[in-house]
A protein has these predicted regions:
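Non-catalytic, mostly N-terminal accessory regions of nucleic-acid modification and defense proteins
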Residues: 1-164, 168
Length: 169
């Protein structure tokens, strides 16, 4: 069940995209999906690390150690949503554009995999650091609200609201 407060936050997220110049609903949905994936990747990695620790099993984080993108390297922890969401807007934007997005595009090393084929043409379209900062802050608030609700169907309801361009209703 989506509350009025949660719907308002989702409407606000749409508004950020629209006022920031991304007015094509398909582009907005695409960018939201990429950002949700990036956040969920961090969450899933954290959950797997906790489960492995509880069971006394080894865990190899996808963010562990140095990550090579092209001919450059970065500490993998810098690619985690939980790390870069606290960066100043300009640093967050450059990290997303130069590191995080290329990282998710090449996450599956096999160039022939379905993942690689779908992500191969992916483009980060958020035009400004301030806009990305607002989007990330709003998405964090949405995820926090979803966690408080803890309803099994909330995630699906939120995805439906993400895909309906509310500000134009």
């Amino acid at each position: 069940m989506v509350t009025g407060e949660l719907k308002s936050k989702i409407d606000n997220l749409w508004e950020i995209f629209w006022t920031g110049g991304l007015t094509n609903p398909l582009d907005v949905i695409e960018q939201m999906t990429y950002l949700m994936f990036i956040r969920d990747l961090d969450d899933a990695d954290n959950i797997h690390a906790k489960e492995a620790a509880m069971l006394g099993l080894p865990h190899k984080s996808i963010f562990a150690g140095e990550i090579q993108i092209g001919d450059r390297k970065i500490d993998g922890s810098q690619l985690k949503w939980s790390t870069f969401h606290d960066f100043p807007a300009a640093k967050m934007y450059s990290t997303m554009q130069e590191w995080v997005f290329p990282f998710i595009k090449n996450l599956h090393g096999d160039k022939e995999s379905a993942y690689s084929k779908y992500m191969g043409d992916a483009i980060f379209k958020v035009p400004t650091p301030l806009m990305l900062d607002k989007i990330v802050t709003t998405m964090d608030a949405i995820y926090e609200q979803m966690e408080q609700i803890k309803s099994a169907d909330t995630r699906g309801d939120v995805c439906l609201l993400y895909t309906s361009p509310s500000p134009r209703d």
